[in-house]
């Protein structure tokens, strides 16, 4: 619509008569434009409507009936209709319900995550994640550094020291006494062990293995200047071979040096034992230093160092016999294979499945020996189990009827050989239980003197 030709006429008419000019302008505007100017916005018209729009039933609308939805769903006449339009409406309702349920679940999960974050905070969450292994720990939490690191203090190394300083110095002297080929091989050891040291410093906090644990005491003598790199090469190659034992087998030279170190440790821990005996025990234990030390302590703990020659050889044979036995899978099976040494088993560490020594009051002798007379003609195997020990609680099916397993028993020799030995042994009269089979504690009768 173009109003340009009409503008001059309007201006001229306004100059002639103002009322006529206004009438001419109103007559020149089209009717559609006048209607748009006089009509209000649609929101105002809907708000001004007398009857607002209410939701209607879709099934009824499909069938040409208009009905309000409020209170109508249960009583709709087409609620079970299976026509195409009603089926489409049912599918739409199902999809909308699934979407609403999914949104509710997502909102609930977000709220739970927000609550956990507010509850634990950022620092605690990182600490828990690092403890669970999700996030690698930070470098300032590292306890053990590499072999060549100078940052670790003397106190932190002393706290986690595996071998004493004297043992390390002693082992280095023996390494020096072996010969010069060890030093020539160790000249190239720092170059080869430097990546291992860097690897141990980087992965010690991630893997938490014991290789960096072993490396930390080695770095202390290296910093003090007491030893050369050749003397440390034995322990360095030892820890390096343990680090890479999953990938490749250790070399024979490293195995020999490990064996020599084990022998040196055993000789310094047990200076009273012969080196050949210690080598046999270590070989029987599969070159395990800890197991060999346990065997020697269990077998020779209660014996004096100044024993006679035959007694010492007998102890060595017993130690070798116990060391050559195969390692058992469980603790109870391991206790069955331990040999019985005189005086080695006291009341505090007796096992239920190992033979016990006879009681001193019953046989009138020192508990560290077997004081059976030669006139009895009995070997020590007849003395199966003691009378008052907790080991009999497990052996009652084999010794007695087992009615009261935890109380005192008569000794086996007291009733097994009552007609033959009771008058000839050195049994005390007050120790014999004449009131019954199980003694005064079970029969509730005073002991007859």
Swiss-Prot record:
It holds the Pfam family DMRT5_DMB. Belongs to the DMRT family. Residues 260-295 form the DMA domain. Disulfide bonds: none annotated. Its main location: nucleus. Residues 166-187 have a biased composition (Polar residues). Keywords: DNA-binding, Metal-binding, Nucleus, Zinc. It comes from Xiphophorus maculatus. One of its GO terms (biological process) is sex differentiation. This is Doublesex- and mab-3-related transcription factor A2. One of its GO terms (cellular component) is nucleus. Residues 57-104 bind DNA. GO terms for molecular function: DNA-binding transcription factor activity, RNA polymerase II-specific; metal ion binding; RNA polymerase II cis-regulatory region sequence-specific DNA binding. Residues 230-240 have a biased composition (Low complexity). It comes from the Eukaryota. May be involved in sexual development. It is found in: Nucleus. Residues 163-259 are annotated as: Disordered. Expressed in brain and eye. InterPro entries: DM_DNA-bd, DM_DNA-bd_sf, DMA, DMRT, DMRT5_1_DMB_dom, UBA-like_sf.
């Amino acid at each position: 619509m173009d109003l340009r030709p009409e503008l001059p006429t309007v201006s001229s008419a306004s100059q002639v008569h103002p009322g006529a000019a206004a009438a001419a302008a109103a007559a020149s505007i089209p009717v559609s434009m006048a209607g748009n100017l006089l009509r209000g916005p649609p929101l105002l018209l809907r708000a001004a409507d007398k009857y607002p729009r209410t939701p209607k039933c879709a099934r009824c609308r499909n069938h040409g009936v208009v009905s309000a939805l409020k209170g109508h769903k249960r009583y709709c006449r087409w609620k079970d209709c299976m026509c195409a339009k009603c089926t489409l409406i049912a599918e739409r309702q199902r999809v909308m319900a699934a979407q609403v349920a999914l949104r509710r679940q997502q909102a609930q999960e977000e709220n739970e995550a927000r609550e956990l974050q507010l509850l634990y905070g950022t620092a605690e969450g990182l600490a828990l994640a690092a403890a669970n292994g999700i996030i690698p720990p930070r470098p300032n939490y590292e306890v053990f550094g590499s072999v060549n690191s100078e940052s670790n203090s003397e106190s932190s190394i002393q706290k986690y020291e595996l071998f004493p300083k004297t043992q390390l110095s002693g082992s280095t002297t023996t390494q020096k006494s072996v010969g010069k080929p060890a030093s020539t091989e160790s000249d190239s050891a720092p170059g080869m062990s430097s990546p291992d040291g860097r690897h141990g410093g980087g992965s010690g906090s991630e893997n938490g293995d014991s290789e960096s644990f072993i490396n930390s005491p080695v770095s202390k003598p290296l910093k003090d200047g007491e030893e050369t790199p050749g003397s440390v090469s034995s322990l360095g190659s030892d820890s390096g071979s343990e680090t890479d034992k999953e990938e490749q087998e250790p070399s024979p030279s490293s195995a020999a040096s490990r064996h020599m170190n084990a022998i040196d440790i055993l000789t310094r821990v047990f200076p009273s034992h012969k080196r050949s005996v210690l080598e046999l025990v270590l070989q029987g234990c599969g070159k395990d230093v800890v197991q060999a030390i346990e065997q020697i302590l269990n077998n020779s703990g209660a014996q004096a160092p100044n024993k006679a020659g035959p007694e010492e050889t007998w102890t060595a044979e017993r130690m070798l016999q116990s060391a050559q036995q195969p390692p058992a899978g469980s603790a109870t099976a391991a206790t069955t294979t331990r040999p019985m040494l005189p005086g080695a088993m006291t009341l505090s560490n007796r096992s239920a499945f190992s033979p016990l020594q006879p009681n001193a009051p019953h046989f009138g002798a020192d508990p560290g020996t077997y004081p059976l007379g030669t006139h009895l003609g009995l070997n020590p195997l007849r003395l199966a189990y003691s009378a008052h020990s907790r080991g009999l609680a497990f052996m009652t099916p084999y010794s007695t009827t087992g009615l009261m397993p935890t109380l005192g028993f008569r000794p086996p020799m007291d009733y097994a050989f009552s007609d033959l030995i009771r008058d000839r042994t050195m049994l005390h009269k007050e120790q014999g239980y004449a009131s019954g089979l199980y003694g005064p504690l079970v029969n509730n009768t005073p002991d007859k003197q």
